[in-house]
Amino acid sequence: MSNISLIVGLGNPGSEYAQTRHNAGFWFVEQLADKYGITIKNDPKFHGISGRGNIEGHDVRLLLPMTYMNRSGQSVVPFSKFYQIAPEAILIAHDELDMNPGVIRLKTGGGHGGHNGLRDIVPHIGPNFHRLRIGIGHPGSKERVSGHVLGKAPSSEQSLMDGAIDHALSKVKLLVQGQVPQAMNQINAYKPA
């Protein structure tokens, strides 16, 4: 099993989107950077914000595409190709409509599952990367999805998402060590307090 050496957070750039549910992937990577003291800075060559640092003795790159969600591939694809990072060594953190707030799942492979950020990445690097799916809940009807993902969660939901993200952050050491099955078991077993 490959060591994870690129961790990507999906979201939308700009302060107006910073606290919206669609930015759950950004939240994860920003908190990871804080936890390990990794500076992330503007990286115009790859249309994003990136950083490189040491996580538990492993060299890891972080990337936040600044392309807007639907064009995430314009950042992730050239970045991973330039640094020669195989899909199996990539973790992409993103919001997940089909899971409730407080639920978090690590998954390897699969399609885009209707997620527009993944939809722009999968055709170019294939499906074999790892996904950290952060539950944001579904509004109930398809017509309300856009407003839901681009809306701010009430504090009760936000605290559930924060707890799930904190739990996943504590398992990153397993991912960078290549212990993906163990990380998957521990992340997927999480239950909100």
Swiss-Prot record:
TRNA binds at Y17, Y68, N70, N116. Belongs to the PTH family. NCBIfam families: pth. This is Peptidyl-tRNA hydrolase. The record marks N12 as: Discriminates between blocked and unblocked aminoacyl-tRNA. Keywords: Cytoplasm, Hydrolase, RNA-binding, tRNA-binding. The active site is at H22. Hydrolyzes ribosome-free peptidyl-tRNAs (with 1 or more amino acids incorporated), which drop off the ribosome during protein synthesis, or as a result of ribosome stalling. Catalyzes the release of premature peptidyl moieties from peptidyl-tRNA molecules trapped in stalled 50S ribosomal subunits, and thus maintains levels of free tRNAs and 50S ribosomes. One of its GO terms (cellular component) is cytoplasm. Its main location: cytoplasm. It catalyses: an N-acyl-L-alpha-aminoacyl-tRNA + H2O = an N-acyl-L-amino acid + a tRNA + H(+). HAMAP family: Pept_tRNA_hydro_bact. Its EC number is 3.1.1.29. GO terms for biological process: protein quality control for misfolded or incompletely synthesized proteins; rescue of stalled ribosome. PANTHER family: PEPTIDYL-TRNA HYDROLASE. One of its GO terms (molecular function) is tRNA binding.
